[in-house]
Amino acid sequence: MAGMGKPYGGRPGDAFEGLVQRIRLIVPATLRGGGGESGPYSPSNPPSRCAFQFHGQDGSDEAFPIEYVLRLMNDWADVPCNPYLRVQNTGVSVLFQGFFNRPHGAPGGAITAEQTNVILHSTETTGLSLGDLDDVKGRLGLDARPMMASMWISCFVRMPRVQLAFRFMGPEDAVRTRRILCRAAEQALARRRRSRRSQDDYGAVVVAAAHHSSGAPGPGVAASGPPAPPGRGPARPWHQAVQLFRAPRPGPPALLLLAAGLFLGAAIWWAVGARL
């Protein structure tokens, strides 16, 4: 996506900060925190440690958009990655931490198509990667298209326990959402066809201009005469007629015609004189 012009700042640090700001916008405001490991990171050099973290206090009931956040991280990165979200019961709060790849020793596999509820006691940890999330979605036979089923974490913090429910939530009106997706796909195809058509037209204009500048006939145009002098436009029909009259035509030289006339006159004069 970098070649398409990502909506992040020009400097690498600004690019990563833009990603963190977007994550802050979609995470509930009651969850505190935001930034993780600091550094001049970019889509081609994402953080190897914690990218962001949020805290939920005791007594809070939050819904964390895990799938949206993980896909946002995956789309931002220009290098292969498998974003991972770790959830920990610290004993006084619940901690959400995001990584571009699962850290060494981090738990995984606790969430399956059959097991979507987890209870964390003090200092216990669980987590889920984007690859495992897609596997669960496929096993459940859910619609994998955007804006359809998306996983959220319902978090209930009641110390010393934290209850987590991993649930897929769909749009309120699935039929209308499918129509929007189909319309968006049709518009994208139409834009692509228009772009290709405009590129073809531009290429034809460039080729014609190149042939015109070199004096050679364009594609599909037969040469009907010598090329026009540089800097002059095509000759008009009346000008072409005048040029035809002005052009020298092949024939005997004038001196030869004069000699022949004199010889013919002398012969006639000799014949008449002989008769007299």
Swiss-Prot record:
Organism annotation: Human herpesvirus 2 (strain HG52)
Transmembrane intervals: 254-274
Cross-referenced InterPro entries: Herpesvirus_viron_egress-type
One Pfam family from the record: Herpes_U34
Post-translational modification: Phosphorylated.
Protein name (Swiss-Prot/TrEMBL): Nuclear egress protein 2
Encoding gene, per UniProt annotation: NEC2
Alphabetical keyword list: Host membrane, Host nucleus, Late protein, Membrane, Phosphoprotein, Transmembrane, Transmembrane helix
Ranges for region Disordered: 212-237
Subunit and partners: Forms a heterohexameric complex with NEC1.
Perinuclear space side: 1-253
GO BP annotations, alphabetical order: viral budding from nuclear membrane
